[in-house]
Amino acid sequence: MPSLQKTKNRIALIDNIKKITKAMELVATSKMKKTQKHFLEVNEFSQSVLDIFSKIVSQIDPQIKLYPDGQKNSTLYIVISSDIGLAGSYNSNIFKILNSNIKNEDKLILIGQKAINFFSNRQDQIIETFKALPDYVTYKIAKLISDSALNSFLNKDVNQIKVVYTKFINLINQQEKISTILPIKKNPMKSEIKENAILEFEPDVESVFHKAIPLYLASIIFGFLTESKVSELAARRTAMESASKNAIDLIGNLKIEYNQTRQAKITQEISEIVAGSVE
């Protein structure tokens, strides 16, 4: 028969844990709402830059080479994770999809302490690491990351750059993704700029293209960083909400167990008293 005091202590312990998970859920919800607004603003900016850049690419003669020759057959992965856990499968899903694609000759730029820890056995593949990013990711941070990635590309260390991030679908669902950001294919997507719009490039479209690449990369990475942050907070909110509900259920079961044990003990004591009086 379980000890009444032991069961009571377990109830108190789980109740304290529930208070912590509930507080973390509320904090994540508050942060997520603010970060989601930031993401929508950044996404609008990133999409505008991408739209203009797509138009630039569409104006370039297909015969013209946009990128340096002699690049190594290697991919640079920019991996966006979190610094802390308690976010369900947010980080593990990122690592799983990357492990399914990465090769020994590939390179890594790791964002977030979780990715840094997970890939610590791939030190020879790591170009740079970033951690302790704020909830409100700034363009300056995105620029630092994009500059590091672009240097590897222009130095011919890699022949393509991909971002491993978490796409925000809604408050419940987020999806890990791998997106190629360099090289850019001709006419990568339909531009929202009107087809009859007249664009003039000085001194020429190729020069504008090469000048615009840093802005394009930083803007796209900026969007991925903010989207991943929203996804992280949404995943943490869901995980803490689930933990709080599980704690409530467990406390309920323990209270039933406590009452049953208490009732059994009382019944046993009554039986002993009755048996003693009969004797």
Swiss-Prot record:
Chief location category: membrane
Topology class, membrane: Peripheral membrane protein
CDD domains linked: F1-ATPase_gamma
Subcellular location(s) per record: Cell membrane
GO cellular component, one term: proton-transporting ATP synthase complex
Keywords: ATP synthesis, Cell membrane, CF(1), Hydrogen ion transport, Ion transport, Membrane, Transport
Single Gene Ontology MF annotation: ATP binding
Signal peptide: none
GO BP: proton motive force-driven plasma membrane ATP synthesis
Protein family per UniProt: Belongs to the ATPase gamma chain family.
Annotated function: Produces ATP from ADP in the presence of a proton gradient across the membrane. The gamma chain is believed to be important in regulating ATPase activity and the flow of protons through the CF(0) complex.
UniProt xrefs under NCBIfam families: ATPsyn_F1gamma (TIGR01146)
Binding partners and assembly: F-type ATPases have 2 components, CF(1) - the catalytic core - and CF(0) - the membrane proton channel. CF(1) has five subunits: alpha(3), beta(3), gamma(1), delta(1), epsilon(1). CF(0) has three main subunits: a, b and c.
Protein name as annotated: ATP synthase gamma chain
